[in-house]
């Protein structure tokens, strides 16, 4: 059984070697799986996402996010997209809030903010790990796709940025990564273009095309793998278009990407 955040509620034994976790195991991961079967003093939840059309689940290892990856959004955030190289940040796996297809899930308004923003994003799920991945092979590492929201405490992000401090507190908190189930790339193909939009209470806020990304999904995989070895279970939030904006309690957020079922949450 899983709750809305994707946690397995029963024993973790075998998690690392069953179902979708068997996507691509390295020797190091196999060793880790052996260790995982040993007795521990307490249980640590494993975040998983359902796989559409399957009884498998996708185990989430790391949540990577790219910043300012659409030119118009970079400009509205005060950056010059023609000069700046890509940069990435991470959210904790327990930031994930699973949103089933066809449901409007309650999304809690977080503490410590008075300026809570939506960001609609295509999410790539990694099934084959690697280091220093080449561009021509990058998409071979993608196992599936879904859509997700990078919810942001914008006032805290801005405050920390002005102080030249890391703005993790504005991005990495409970429920800050609503996300749909994983769709296998064998069923969807790769998403290089297509409409991406977000509505709040039925009115369009964000509206763009995936082909307007500054750095494509393949290029993001290349850049990420130069800094960190990627592993099965990593997911990549690939950036948001312009017109991010605030939401308040009672607002309903609906997100769309061509070729994927819509995602909807209600801020409570």
Q: Where do the protein language model's features map onto the residues?
A:
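A generic structural signal for short beta-strands and their flanking turns/coil linkers
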Residues: 83-85, 92, 118-122, 141-147, ...
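Hydrophobic, well-structured mid-protein blocks that either form specific transmembrane helices
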Residues: 132-169
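Short, structured patches in soluble enzyme cores that scaffold and shape functional sites
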Residues: 91, 122, 126-128, 146-151, ...
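N-terminal secretory signal peptides and thylakoid transit peptides that target proteins
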Residues: 1-18
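Hydrophobic h-region of N-terminal signal peptides that target proteins for export
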Residues: 20-25
């Amino acid at each position: 059984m899983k709750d809305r955040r994707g946690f397995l509620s029963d024993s973790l034994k075998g998690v690392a070697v069953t179902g979708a976790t068997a996507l691509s195991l390295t020797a190091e991961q196999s060793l880790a799986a052996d260790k995982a079967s040993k007795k521990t003093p307490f249980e640590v939840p494993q975040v998983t996402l359902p796989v559409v059309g399957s009884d498998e689940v996708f185990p989430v290892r790391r949540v990577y996010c790219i910043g300012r990856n659409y030119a118009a959004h970079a400009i509205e955030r005060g950056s010059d997209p023609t000069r700046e190289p890509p940069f990435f940040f991470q959210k904790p796996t327990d930031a994930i809030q699973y949103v089933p297809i066809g449901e409007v899930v309650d999304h809690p308004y977080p503490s410590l903010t008075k300026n809570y923003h939506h960001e609609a994003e295509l999410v790539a799920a990694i099934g084959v790990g690697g280091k220093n991945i080449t561009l021509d092979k990058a998409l071979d590492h993608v196992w599936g796709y879904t859509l997700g929201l990078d919810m942001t405490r914008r006032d805290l992000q801005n405050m920390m940025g002005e102080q030249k401090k890391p703005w993790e507190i504005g991005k990495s908190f409970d429920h800050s990564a609503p996300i749909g189930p994983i769709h296998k790339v064998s069923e969807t193909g790769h998403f290089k273009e297509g409409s991406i939009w977000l509505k709040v209470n039925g009115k369009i806020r964000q509206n763009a095309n995936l082909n307007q990304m500054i750095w494509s999904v393949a290029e993001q995989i290349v850049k990420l793998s130069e800094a960190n070895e990627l592993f099965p279970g990593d997911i990549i939030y690939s950036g948001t278009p312009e017109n991010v904006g605030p939401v308040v309690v009672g607002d309903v957020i609906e997100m769309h990407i061509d070729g994927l079922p819509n995602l909807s949450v209600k801020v409570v």
